[in-house]
């Protein structure tokens, strides 16, 4: 496997002066506009075992995820306003299917999930004083798995039509044993309720496990429409910002900037909506995946096999999207069996194309685009 840099180098040139300076100042502007500022916490609490009973994390502590931590089925994790989770390399949080998470941040007291290296730059423990750094991959991510319909054809026993028995293993997670159910998502409940996220900032995270096997900033697998996500920020993630696999979950008020691959990635039949977004793509001299270069702003895919259902029929509203000028990267990339609508969105500074059709499986994505089906 090719080695992956943990740094996020950025090119300096007049062409990218606006984006470069926007990146430098976006910690302040983005967090202020979204209300993502707040007070720091006190003593550190190491978290080294899975969460098997309902648990509350308070803003009087900081929490250090030591390894891959699961919220197990039947358990609920509640995170109070103003709580800071500051982890070492390798720390990540995954909410298994059948568990719930409630991130109860507010405009004045957001929940911050970041690295200990980030917190070390805070003066007096105040996150408003943090220094933006050209870095990523300093901890893992937040993954939430649910019970909604997905279209996934590589799992033995899955079928081509929507089925409650279809499931998949979540990208980037490690099984404790073969067939570990805690890494699985998908089912037959499009009203799945895996909890809620309100005012959450995810910073300096992500992990490239292997080719096409990464931890995104926020990974959502098979979540239903009863799951609520409102006001979330992803900054400096080494892979995608947000990736959604199937389900019907909706999102409002999202900010994604300076990530190493796609900002907003969709797969396996997502049928939800996203509204009020800001995307600023990462830019680097090194165009390899996971190095800090942004790929597509939006990448939309359906089933891995285009005969499989449900297809991706999502909608994006009121997004401002700033790309980066690397050839081969698109403001929107369309792959097989994805039919996404964009309403009242502004796209600027794209790479090769504003709309790019990737006919990877040879089953007509380009044709669907040109004949108006999409």
Where in the sequence are the language-model features?
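Extracellular beta-rich repeat passengers
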Residues: 43-78, 90-100, 105-106, 110-260, ...
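Gram-negative bacterial Sec-dependent N-terminal signal peptides
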Residues: 1-41
């Amino acid at each position: 496997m090719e080695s992956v840099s943990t740094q996020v180098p950025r090119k300096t040139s007049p062409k990218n002066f606006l984006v470069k300076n926007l990146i430098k100042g976006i910690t302040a502007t983005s967090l202020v506009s979204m209300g993502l500022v707040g007070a720091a916490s006190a003593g550190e609490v190491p978290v080294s075992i899975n969460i098997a009973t309902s648990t509350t994390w308070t803003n009087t502590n900081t929490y250090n995820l030591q390894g891959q931590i699961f919220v197990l089925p039947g358990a609920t994790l509640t995170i109070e306003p103003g709580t800071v989770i500051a982890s070492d390399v390798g720390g990540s949080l995954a909410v298994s299917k059948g568990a719930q998470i409630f991130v109860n941040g507010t405009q004045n007291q957001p929940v911050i999930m970041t690295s200990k290296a980030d917190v070390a730059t805070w003066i007096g423990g105040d996150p408003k004083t943090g220094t933006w750094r050209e870095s990523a991959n300093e901890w893992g991510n937040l993954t939430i798995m649910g019970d909604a319909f997905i279209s996934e054809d590589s799992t033995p026993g899955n079928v081509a039509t929507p089925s409650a028995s279809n499931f998949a293993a979540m990208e980037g997670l490690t099984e404790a044993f073969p067939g570990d159910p805690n890494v699985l998502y998908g089912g037959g409940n499009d009203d799945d309720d895996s909890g809620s996220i309100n005012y959450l900032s995810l910073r300096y995270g992500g992990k490239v496990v292997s080719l096409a096997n990464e931890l995104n900033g926020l990974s959502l697998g098979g979540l239903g429409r009863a799951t609520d996500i409102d006001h979330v920020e992803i900054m400096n993630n080494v892979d995608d910002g947000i990736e959604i696999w199937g389900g019907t979950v909706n999102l409002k008020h999202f900010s994604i900037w300076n990530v190493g691959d796609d900002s907003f990635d969709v797969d396996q039949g997502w049928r939800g909506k996203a509204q009020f977004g800001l995307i600023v793509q990462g830019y680097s001299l090194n165009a390899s995946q996971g190095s800090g270069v942004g790929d597509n702003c939006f990448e939309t895919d359906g089933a891995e096999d285009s005969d499989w259902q449900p297809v991706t029929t999502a909608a994006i509203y009121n997004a401002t999207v700033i790309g980066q000028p690397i050839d081969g990267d698109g403001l929107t990339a369309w792959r097989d069996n994805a039919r996404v609508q964009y309403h009242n969105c502004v796209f600027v500074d794209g790479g090769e194309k504003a709309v790019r059709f990737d006919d990877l499986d040879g089953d007509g994505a380009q044709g669907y685009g040109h004949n108006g089906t999409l």
